[in-house]
Curated annotation (Swiss-Prot):
SUPFAM superfamilies: Trypsin-like serine proteases. One of its GO terms (cellular component) is extracellular region. It comes from the Eukaryota. Keywords: Blood coagulation cascade activating toxin, Disulfide bond, Glycoprotein, Hemostasis impairing toxin, Hydrolase, Hypotensive agent, Protease, Secreted, Serine protease, Toxin. CDD domains: Tryp_SPc. One of its GO terms (biological process) is proteolysis. The lineage of its organism: Eukaryota, Metazoa, Chordata, Craniata, Vertebrata. This is Thrombin-like enzyme elegaxobin-2. It comes from Protobothrops elegans.
Amino acid sequence: VIGGDECNINEHPFLVLVYYDEYQCGGTLINEEWVLTAAHCDGENMEIHLGMHSKKVPNKDRRRRVPKEKFFCDSSKNYTKWNKDIMLIRLNRPVRKSAHIAPLSLPSSPPSVGSVCRIMGWGTISPTEETYPDVPHCANINLLDYEVCRAAYPELPATSRTLCAGILEGGKDSCGGDSGGPLICNGQFQGIVSWGGDPCAQPHEPGSYTNVFDHLDWIKGIIAGNTDATCPL
C-alpha cells in the first residue's frame, strides 16, 4: 500500500497473507473455513497465514493453513484484468476466532461511488521499488466512477464487474503484493485488489478491484456446496 500508515494491529483480523511460488498476496477470511482472494494469486505451494501483523514478531494466535480446494469463476481459470479475477479457497481445516482472527462479512448492499474505502496489505510501500514492510499498511481511498478507470485504461470494456478506486491526485494506492486483499467501503467488503497503473499511485490512474457484491450468488453457492455455481457474465 502506497501513502498509508501501519494498520492498527486490531483492525484487520480478517486479513490473510497468502504466499505462493515466490510471491505474496492478500486475502480475506469470510468464515472459519473460506478465504476470498484474486484468481491471479493462484500458484503452487500456497500457504495462508492468518492472525498476522508483524512478520518478524508473530502474534501468538497466528495460524497457517493450506488450500484444501480452490474455486474459480469457471473451471478453465479464465480471467482477465477486468473480469473474473476472483478465487475462493477452502482451508484444509477451519480456524477459530481469536484475538487477531475473525471473518469479515460479505456486503449487504452494493457499493456507492463517493464512498471512502480502506485498503490494506503487506505489499510494497514504494511505487518504484519493491519495498515490502514487516507490518501491513492501511490507507483510505475513494470509490470513483468506472469512467475514471476507462479514461486511464482504454482497454477496459464499456462495463465490467470491477470497481474503480483511488485518489485522483495520486499518492495513495494498493500496489504489488497487495493483490487479493480487501477494499472495505463504508465498512462493507466491496472489492478485491486486482490490478492498476504501473507504477502505482500515479495521478488519474486508480486501481481496479473485483466487485464482490456482483459475485455474491457464486460465492454463497460454492460455500453451500453447489460446485456448479457460475459467476455473472
